[in-house]
Amino acid sequence: DLLKEALRNDAATGNYSHLVVAIMGWRTPQEEAIRNFNSLARGMHLAAKGDFRPLFVGITWVGPWASRWLDPLIEAFAYARIAELADTLGLTWVGVIADEIALPMSASLPTIFITHSFGTRAATTALCIGPAIRRDAGSPLVRPPGAIDRLFGFQPAFSLQRFKKDRLIFFYEDVYFPNDCDRVKSIVLTTSRHDKATRAILWADLAGNYRYFRSFCRGNSGRLVSCTSVDATGAIEGTYDESMKVLYLDATKLVRFEAPGTDGGSHSDIFRPPVGRFIWNLIAAPPPGVSRSAPAK
C-alpha cells in the first residue's frame, strides 16, 4: 500500500512521461539488477532527448543455484525449478503489482514492462493470467482496468506456445494465456544467434532460442506474430504488421556481445545505448489500436 500510494502521488505531479516496470532474469543479484536498470533508463533517456521522464519500478529476485561459478550443464538441469519459480512469481507478487499498480495507473501514464530471460516469463504470467492470490480474501475478484502499452522481453525464457490452445509437447510450458493476453497491447520479443543460454535448454521451446525463432516464424508469422529483425543501431529492419500482438525480432546484430561478468554468450547484452534507442523508438510510437496525438506531458 505504501508503494501504491507513493507512485500515485508521484504520478499526480505530472512530472513523469512513462511508468516503467522492469524485472531481470535469474542469477541477477539486486546490486547488479539496479545497475542494469540504470543502464536501460540512461540509454532510453539519451535516445529520447528529454522526452523520457520515467517513474521507474524495479523488481529484483534471485533463484536457487544463482552463483556465477556454476557449470552451464548444472544450470541447464536447474531449469525446471527456475521456470516454476518464475511462473510462481508471476502468479503471486509480480501479478499483484501488475493488478494493483501498473494496470490502474496505465490509464493516466503510458506504461511499459522491460524484462529479460526468466523475468519475461514472470511478467507475462503476471499480465496474461494475473495473480492467483489476493491480499483481501474477503473482497470479490475484480478485473482491474487498463492495459500495458508494451512489454519488452529480451531473450525470453518462455514458450510462445502459451498463446496457442494446441496440446503442448514440451515440459514446463503447460500454461495457456487466455484472451490473447488482452491486458497487454503489444509484446516485443528478441532472440539472437549469439545467445548460448537459451540454446542450451533442449526440453523447452524458449522464445529466446534462435532456432525456435526460425521454426516458429515459418509456421506462424502473420497469424500469431509478426517476425522481422533489428539492426545494430536499434532500428527495426524491413516492415512488420503492427496489428499483431507479438512482434518477434531477430536481434542478432544488436544482441551480440558478452556482457562483462556474465556467461551464456550474448544472453545479457541488453544494456548498451543501442538497446535503449530500440526501446525508445517503439514506445515513442503508439501501440496497436491506439492513437496518440501528442506526447505525454
Language model: regions and residue ranges:
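Active-site micro-motifs of SAM-dependent methyltransferase domains
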Residues: T28, T120, F158
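Lipolytic serine-hydrolase domain surface
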Residues: D51, W61-L109, L127-K297
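Short, surface-exposed "cap/lid" segments of acyl-processing enzymes
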Residues: A6-R68
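Extracytoplasmic/secreted envelope proteins and their assembly/folding machinery
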Residues: L3-R8, I34-A41, L91, G95-A98, ...
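Short hydrophobic segments within beta-strands
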Residues: A22-I23, I114, T190
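Soluble non-cytosolic domains of exported or imported proteins
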Residues: S17, Q30-R35, A80-T92, S117
